[in-house]
Amino acid sequence: EYISGEHLEQDIEKGIALLTECADSGDVIASYRLGKIYLQGEIMFQNLDKAERYLLLAEDNEYVQYALAKLYLQEEKYEIQKAVNYFGRSADKNHWASYQLGRIYLFGAAELTKDKEQAIEWFTKSANDGNEYAQAMLDNISKFENDLLANTIFSLFVSLSRCIQDSYDNDHK
């Protein structure tokens, strides 16, 4: 309540200190709240190491698992396999987790190849759980594939034109 200032005068430092004390004593709710605060970087400066530390203290909760998955998609902490694992653990009770898995499998990631069938499975689960965005992805999945193909071809042409330009420049120096 010190953080929100709802029933007490707002004192963010005191609120963070109390949450830290509770989290360090094993309070999973405090761990989750503190982890999210450090992950979001709105109340305090973003600190992904602290976010990870506190979220891991409460990792059995599906909301914490979702937050951990989002953490592992951050550039500084990027580990796609951990993100997929935590989204998967959270997906039974969190339709946003299954939606995110659908996106990851549809668009692919650094060490994870695209898998349209997996994407459809996750989007279907998410849509069946009430996620309208997942339903929109299912309704338009071929459009996204065509856009991906067009972007890939365009990127190849850009790379090819750079190679041709470099070769031309080297030949005409």
Q: What name fits each language-model region?
A:
Residues E1-S4, R33-Q40, Q65-Q74, Q100-F107, ...:
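Hydrophobic face of amphipathic alpha-helices that form TPR/SEL1-like repeat modules
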Residues Y2-E6, D24-D27, Q40-E42, D60-Y63, ...:
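Short helix-capping/linker turns of helical repeat alpha-solenoids
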Residues E9-L18, F45-Y54, E76-Y86, L112-W122, ...:
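Structural signature of tandem alpha-helical TPR/SEL1-like repeats
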Residues E21-C22, L57-A58, R89-S90, K125-S126:
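Canonical positions in the second alpha-helix
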Residues I43, S142-L160:
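Alpha-helical linker/edge segments of TPR/alpha-solenoid repeat scaffolds
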Residues A58-D60, E117-E132, D139, I153-F157:
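TPR/TPR-like (Sel1-like) alpha-helical repeat modules
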Residues S159-K173:
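Low-complexity, charge- and small-residue-enriched intrinsically disordered regions
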